[in-house]
């Protein structure tokens, strides 16, 4: 079987970054945004990590979004989570974009994605689906690309597994209607 589909990672691949510096800057910005609403910074970061762990352990019975918020609600309470969800959405639409300054830029990323598409390959973004679509779309733009450059891109709303679970890659292939052996990561 021939390779028909190219899957790219985002963080550290299409979007150059020091993962530790990015995570530190991202959490600092999120904590600053949410502190006035009763979120103590260290507790918030711990809760985000707990929600992330819940997504990584997701068995496919729910979306990663549902796994995250279930864990987050267990820490902060269902009512607070529901009332404050808009604060998180506003953060990803606005303050999150300051993290772009922490990331690098590689024009070869844009050139490579476009060239592969010109050559007839299907191109998908198989980034670890631990972020909402808005954050993923922003990071795609930071790399000089657009969401439309990809046939699909994974987010916590649309995925039920995370890396490194092999089921994540099968889920991506199924979403594309491609056989796993047709895909190159």
Regions found by a protein language model. Give the residues of each.
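Hydrophobic alpha-helical core bundles mediating ligand binding, dimerization, or RNAP-core interactions
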Residues: 23-31, 48-53, 69, 88-96, ...
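Short, solvent-exposed loop/turn segments at secondary-structure boundaries
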Residues: 18-21, 59-60, 100, 164
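Short glycine/proline-centered loop/turn elements that form peptide/ligand docking sites
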Residues: 14, 83-85, 110-115
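Active-site neighborhood of HAD-like aspartate-dependent phosphohydrolases
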Residues: 1-50
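A ubiquitous short alpha-helical element
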Residues: 13-19, 53-57, 122-124
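Substrate-recognition "cap/lid" segment bordering the active-site pocket of phosphatases
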Residues: 124-184
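Substrate-recognition element of Asp-dependent hydrolases with the DxDx(T/V) motif
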Residues: 90-93, 97-105, 109-143
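A metal-dependent, Asp-based hydrolase signature
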Residues: 45-94
């Amino acid at each position: 079987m021939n390779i028909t589909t190219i899957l790219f990672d985002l963080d550290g691949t299409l979007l150059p970054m020091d993962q530790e510096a990015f995570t530190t800057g991202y959490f600092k910005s999120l904590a600053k945004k949410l502190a006035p609403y009763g979120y103590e910074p260290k507790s918030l970061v711990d809760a985000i990590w707990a929600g992330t762990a819940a997504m990584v352990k997701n068995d496919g019975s729910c979306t990663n979004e549902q796994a995250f918020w279930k864990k987050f609600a267990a820490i902060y309470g269902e009512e607070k989570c529901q009332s404050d969800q808009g604060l998180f959405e506003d953060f990803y639409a606005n303050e999150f974009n300051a993290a772009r300054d922490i990331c690098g830029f590689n024009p070869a990323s844009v050139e490579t994605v476009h060239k592969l598409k010109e050559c007839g390959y299907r191109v998908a973004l198989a980034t670890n689906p631990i972020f909402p679509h808005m954050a993923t779309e922003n990071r795609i733009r930071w790399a000089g690309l657009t969401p439309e450059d990809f046939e699909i891109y994974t987010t916590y709303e649309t995925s039920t597994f995370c890396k490194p679970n092999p089921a994540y890659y099968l889920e991506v292939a199924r979403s594309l209607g491609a056989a796993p052996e047709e895909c190159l990561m």
